[in-house]
Amino acid sequence: MPNTYGSRTLTEWLTLVLGVVIILVGLFFVIAGADLAMLGGSVYYVICGIPLVAGGVFMLMGRTLGAFLYLGALAYTWVWSLWEVGFSPVDLLPRDFGPTLLGILVALTIPVLRRMETRRTLRGTV
Amino acid sequence: MRRSHLLATVACATLACAPLAANAQFAPAGSGGSPTSSVPGPGNGSGNSFEPTENTPAAKSRFSGPSPYAPQAPGVNAANLPDIGSMDPNDVPQMAPQQSASPASGDWAAYGHDDSQMRYSPLSEITPQNADQLKVAFVYHTGSYPRPGQTNKWAAETTPIKVGDGLYMCSAQNDIMKLDPATGKEIWRHNINEKYEAIPYTAACKGVTYFTSSQVPEGQPCHNRILEGTLDMRLIAVDAATGNLCEGFGNGGQVNLMQGLGESVPGFVSMTTPPPVVNGVVVVNHEVLDGQRRWAPSGVIRGYDAESGKFLWAWDVNRPNDHSQPTGNNHYSRGTPNSWAAMTGDNALGLVYVPTGNSASDYYSALRSPEENKVSSAVVALDVKTGSPRWVFQTVHKDVWDYDIGSQATLMDMPGQDGQPVPALIMPTKRGQTFVLDRRDGKPILPVEERPAPSPGVIPGDPRSPTQPWSTGMPALRVPDLKETDMWGMSPIDQLFCRIKFRRANYTGEFTPPSVDKPWIEYPGYNGGSDWGSVSYDPQSGILIANWNITPMYDQLVTRKKADELGLMPIDDPNYKPGGGGAEGNGAMDGTPYGIVVTPFWDQYTGMMCNRPPYGMITAIDMEHGQKVLWQHPLGTARANGPWGLPTGLPWEIGTPNNGGSVVTAGGVVFIAAATDNQIRAIDEHTGKVVWSAVLPGGGQANPMTYEANGHQYVAIMAGGHHFMMTPVSDQLVVYALPDHKG
């Protein structure tokens, strides 16, 4: 049963932890990615970092939008990596393996985020 | 480009010129005037007058070695041997027929099987069909491994030889033994009591040499001898039958090879390869520890009478017309290119092929003499009668990348234009360029092109060569120049880290000039391409087998001030503390304006290389039909490798760094260990398919060999490990055979 007043379930806590992880990854992408872009390297990281940070923040706010921002960044990552290295499994490994694993976890949080959103809406209307 | 060039100039002006001025005492004698802000460039010098004289004031940097005229430290003459006398090379007696000239079909009579060093055995009991049944026949323990309190500097790298009833080998610390080839039982062992302090970068003994005397009659002691060069610079001859020292050789069976080398300390200079005997002349080379000081002991090559051990000649690069031993307080000219790879003898032409390395202080070339610049990182064919070069073929001009040649030259015949075979020599290099030369005159048989290289570079007064040689007739044992998209990792996080590392460094390909303002990427690095494992060649099928590395380095020159802060000091500095380890070549380069920092191009937090796999490859090249690649694939699985040094256990053939060569047999099987997955493999010579593999008790960083005993074929590999390759060290020689032939 969803609890009503403040105290969170384990899945909600895990969702928040995931949000923090995504914010940290996103910040690294933005900061180090800006460095890389200024050195003349790929601009992918700094671009991708922005939706990651935003997605993490929205997840912390209990908003489903956060998960979708992450999944959008993941889709962008796949498109970019296929453009950069083609269908080469060895080269797709660092680019997509970790982000996709994280993406599966993020997808699993969508029901949790929905529940949090619903609860907030309910609380808002009571 | 313009911006970075400007930055480089500014950085050089601010960082480099002060130490340059401080070292101006090495300006050529007679140049006069006050210290200048630049060092003499190539061709500006007057040969050996670069080297400090006895009256040169001591260097002013915080750390520095003693004057080259200082006496040798205690223990450098390890066995306190008296000086050896000289004799006229014309008095060398006619050489008896040697086992290595035409070994019995079941023998392995020299480091690379025979005088050709092809690493080819005519044995054929083991085939691609039955290789998967190979089992351990016996294991022999050499007894040499790091004891408690000793830094792990071990990598035995040993290849036994087999002649008649004996398997002869050395331990990593040069003890010599004869084993029963069928059982591994020790027949004799000669301990030479080498000290731990004598170990230079690595405790290695690649092998011993079998020599048959023409002066001692058959049946008498020392008719057949085992010759060995040691880490502590002795040339030792023992009786092949008993292991006793040959009293008639040198001083009671030993020659002190530190004679004439001048100031040194234990571990600075050492021998790790079996010395070849050519027309009765035993030729010795030695490694000089990289990166220590410009005026390190000489890289001189010397010939001795294989019968008496008497000195015959020296090839001292900066004394080209003086082949005698130095007398009194004199020494062979210092800092000259050393040669640490195994040399190859050629009795028919009376030549020894010397693969040379670099002048001392590998990464700074402004203080090298024109004579040194002609012969560094080259194949030098020395006449064994005189010690003079007959020809020189250079593989890198003015090398500042440690692309010294680690491989042994392999002799074979190439089809000539008129159908007559041409005596040829295959010289693999760390660059992955394999040169095929006519061994009569050193002229390329397959085309070699001089191609433009980045020049003049960024270090003032030390311009790079405008061109470098490329062997365009042979498939390159390398991958294309690195790109940012080649950066790898477990995740985008470490990949991003490596991309930044890539972009922060100078990189304009294989000959990126060294820089002090920021790091530069060196690919191929000092680990190869092809390193000391060399190549194997099957003269029946015309197939050449080469294994090679894709292990870039991340290097940076540092100012003298920074080098002092980092505590970089030469090994003969009084403050030097032995132990070191780490990457080879990190060093003070005392006597030059710079020190050098050498690291693998890796993510230092995960210990994973920054570039994408594979990191090691094996290639078969058809030498008879247009030098085409027959097959090529990654060598080594991820089973013993992974992030943070953790073994992943994955059977994925990722291609690991590899050290050590291959053997090819008439049975159509290639044997190779080398990879850091600690396995030995049998590979089908014609298809490249791995038909058998077994896990070794230590890293297989050695050249395997194969021989026959009691009518059956055996395959031996020293699983000695390698400290820098981070594979487990063991003292075990593991010998395999098909079932029912266990010892």
UniProtKB/Swiss-Prot annotation, chain A:
Signal peptide: none annotated. One of its GO terms (molecular function) is glycerol dehydrogenase (acceptor) activity. Its main location: membrane. It is a multi-pass membrane protein. GO terms for cellular component: plasma membrane. Keywords: Cell membrane, Membrane, Oxidoreductase, Transmembrane, Transmembrane helix. It catalyses: glycerol + A = dihydroxyacetone + AH2. It is found in: Cell membrane. Its EC number is 1.1.99.22. The chain crosses the membrane at residues 13-33, 41-61, 67-87, 92-112. Catalyzes the oxidation of glycerol to glycerone. Also acts, more slowly, on a number of other polyols including D-sorbitol, D-arabinitol, D-mannitol, meso-erythritol, adonitol and propylene glycol. This is Glycerol dehydrogenase small subunit. The lineage of its organism: Bacteria, Pseudomonadati, Pseudomonadota, Alphaproteobacteria, Acetobacterales.
